[in-house]
Amino acid sequence: MTVPAVLDSAGRRRSPATLPGYHAGRPPRNKGMRYPADPPTVEEIVAVRRHAADDRHGWRVRAMIIVLWRAGLRVQEALALAEHDLGPRRGSILVRNGKGGRRREVGMDEWGWEQLRPWLDARVQLPVGPLFCIIDGPTRGRPWSGAAVRSEFRRLAVRAGVRRRFAPHQLRHAHAVELAREGVPLNIIQRQLGHANLGTTSIYLQGIDPEEIITAVHARRAPMMSASAGLRL
């Protein structure tokens, strides 16, 4: 039996995952599953963003990639954002209800804010609602779903030729790894990600390539000793 195509108001094919109530009440298929820390590279993330359309749908998914990658949000935290939670002048995003009901403020770089602009400009033309909302049809302005985000990420990753898993949480891992590479202290990374303990943050950093560790340690200088120590090296 052929399932009829689902079209949006412009006649374009629409993923069933974007329909209101899709998989309502069902747990995600990957609930409870653990994936290795294998974050995408900068080149892979940029390639996926470039394959998003140059319209409101594309600007929305590009903006979602940005807040997950450059601010390290969980996908549900991003989907719960309102426009007034954004503080571009301070470079901050307010997460009102993070994991465990915890509230926190996170930072985002200037480049990330610039990348949000096309979607922010388009969003004001839609009904009042969450920052990331449905664009077409009778539910315009209603919340976008996590299932729809994951579906869109998979589709764009295939088009971009990215072979590794490209999912919202992988972008969060990429954020943590990049901060560590840039020398940001572990306790600040922990606060940025909203982790209750450093052990969880350390797991995220397992995505650092062993070759990077070897190179960094191999490049260390010889130990420095004061003359008064009386020790020969």
Where are these regions (language model features)?
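Conserved catalytic core of the tyrosine transesterase superfamily
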Residues: M1-L233
